[in-house]
Amino acid sequence: MNGKTETERLLLRPLSPSDAEAVFAYSREVNVGINAGWKPHESLEESEDALEKVFCGKKGIFGIVHKIDGKLIGTIGVIDDPKRSNPKAGMLGYAMSESYWGKGLMTEAAQTVLRFAFGHMALDLVSAYCYPHNLRSKRVLEKCGFAYEGWLAQSELRFDGALMDEECYVLLKNKSFKE
């Protein structure tokens, strides 16, 4: 999965600066940003900046394209886990346009990216963090075989000044994940 890969309903591919308008379309949705821990984008320039600094040219980060309508509907990736010093550990993160929630699309994308993380990236562990109220994200992780690891009280200062608890989930390479 160096370039792109397809699932039944999705195309996962590297992001480019030309994706800015599509990224802005879902990044300005209030429920997308707030559940992912970032301020909803207020301008196209914010999305362009995020693409340049966070997404473009990064190994393990992909745009999620819905094959039926051809739209870029989200992002997913595995990066270094800032809460762990293990060099063989990564952290799964994702965001998707709210109009595509509840269809199993993020689970489909996550399963593909996890295969990449444990195979191509040679990771031994992938973690994921979500807010306790984010039941949809927890469900994605559970369907991918993640185990609940613990509660991190007041672990994140969100963009709006709220001090947020997080729940941590973990998936080990030697434990099979659900497909």
Regions found by a protein language model. Name each.
Residues 51-63:
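A short helix-loop-beta-strand connector motif used in the catalytic cores of GNAT acetyltransferases and
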Residues 1-31, 61, 65-179:
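Acyl-donor (CoA/ACP) binding surface of acyl/acetyltransferases
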Residues 31-52:
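Conserved GNAT-fold acetyl-CoA-binding loop/helix
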